[in-house]
C-alpha cells in the first residue's frame, strides 16, 4: 500500500482524515452511506466483509482489522473465519450475492 507522510501518529484512515479535515467530512458521509444505510440489498455484515477483503488486497492491516471485526460482529463469526474468507473467498460459505 502506498504511504504518504502525514505528520501525525494516527493509524489507518484516521491519519488521513486528520491530515485533510476539509475532505474528511464528505468521505465520512460516503462511508456511512455505503456501510450503514438501511436501504441496501446487502446486509451490513456483507458490506463490512467487502471492506475487509478490499483492505486485505490493499495490504492495509488497520482497515482489514476494523472492517473484519465489524463483519464478524454482524455475521456472528470469529476472526479465524474472517481470515479464512480473506485467504480463499471463492470457496468460503458465503451468500449467493457475495
Regions found by a protein language model. Name each.
Residues 1-98:
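Hydrophobic alpha-helical segments
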Amino acid at each position: 500500500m502506498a504511504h504518504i507522510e502525514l505528520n501525525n501518529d494516527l493509524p489507518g484512515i484516521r491519519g488521513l482524515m486528520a491530515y485533510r479535515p476539509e475532505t474528511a467530512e464528505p468521505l465520512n458521509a460516503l462511508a456511512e452511506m455505503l456501510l450503514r444505510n438501511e436501504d441496501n440489498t446487502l446486509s451490513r455484515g456483507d458490506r463490512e466483509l467487502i471492506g475487509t477483503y478490499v483492505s486485505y488486497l490493499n495490504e492495509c492491516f488497520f482497515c482489514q482489522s476494523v472492517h473484519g471485526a465489524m463483519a464478524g460482529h454482524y455475521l456472528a463469526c470469529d476472526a479465524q473465519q474472517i481470515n479464512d474468507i480473506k485467504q480463499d473467498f471463492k470457496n468460503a460459505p458465503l451468500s449467493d450475492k457475495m
